[in-house]
């Protein structure tokens, strides 16, 4: 018996205690896949580091995510690839994408924030529901493309 609790009250306490003090279920934040449909564009490696590309993928994802109810801004170059900012009121939210060195036709997309909770001033914001919405829309967009294969999700944490 846990602290004098019996039956379902004990079960609730144990379930609540184990969830709140242990790990939060992992959120899908990173997806890798293979495709020949998103080639490097001429001069793209001048916008980002040599050997990096993903502009065609970023433009496709921006359009596809907007169609799935996740509008955002223009993709912009980073040194690692491309960033697609998404409209979100409570915390900064974006998808990063670019080629993935493990395969000549490999790509990686990742959602930020990748943590289940972010801090804003003195409060904690649960990101899991919104990040999972982005993950579902991202998966739907990639699978709908037809040129995407070997899709595999993983979590950074």
What spans do the regions from the language model cover?
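Ser/Thr-rich, low-complexity intrinsically disordered terminal regions
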Residues: 75-92
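A residue-level signal for beta-strand positions that form part of recognition/binding surfaces
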Residues: 30, 92, 106-108
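N-terminal low-complexity, intrinsically disordered segments
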Residues: 16-60, 66, 70
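Acidic, proline/glycine-rich low-complexity IDRs
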Residues: 1-26, 99-157
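Generic structural motif
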Residues: 72, 93-95, 149, 153
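Short beta-strand-to-loop capping motifs
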Residues: 35, 88, 111-113
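Broad, structure-driven detector of short, well-ordered beta-strand segments within folded domains
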Residues: 91-101
